[in-house]
């Protein structure tokens, strides 16, 4: 896995924290990862962290942006698939199982296997329909004043709990389809790192060589 921040620290990117809470403890996922994969994680760069000071001595520290990707390599260390972002446990298990098959298949058949995956996407039964997420009270209060809500919303989203795993799953399945398309077209990368850089730049819209990761947007209300 490649991620912003460190997997062994509390404040890694939000997705990786949910991997540890929702995915890795799942008995089926845990068994598959333990028995069929050689596990490795690597930080691509530090994750941005924001501190909110309440003015009375209390502070909250949260990560502000970031994403992660699970790479599946064949026995020779060549990528055969990549699972971008967070998925529900059922979908993650299905994608991992399929990617494990890619890793053991004849390399010459890899484009065709990805074409088949594009033609046969996971059925809707693989993940349950999402329930509309309930906005936290701080978000609802901010929306009463729409102008200041535009300024506050990025930080409010950061400190609000993630509640739409199924929504993330749908979004990331669409990103994963683009990875299928790349492999199906015979795309080649000079290295695993080169593939990771393309994923962060093209899929996550987060070039790793951007010093601010897109966070240096001018404040429209600054004097």
Task: Briefly describe each language-model feature range.
Residues 1-9, 13-14, 39:
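Short active-site neighborhood of thiol/selenol oxidoreductases, capturing the structured segment around
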Residues 3-4, 25, 122-123:
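Nucleo/cytoplasmic regulatory scaffolds in medium-to-very-large eukaryotic proteins
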Residues 17-81, 89-99, 149-190:
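Thioredoxin-like thiol-disulfide oxidoreductase module
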Residues 93-223:
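Non-globular targeting/processing and membrane-anchoring segments
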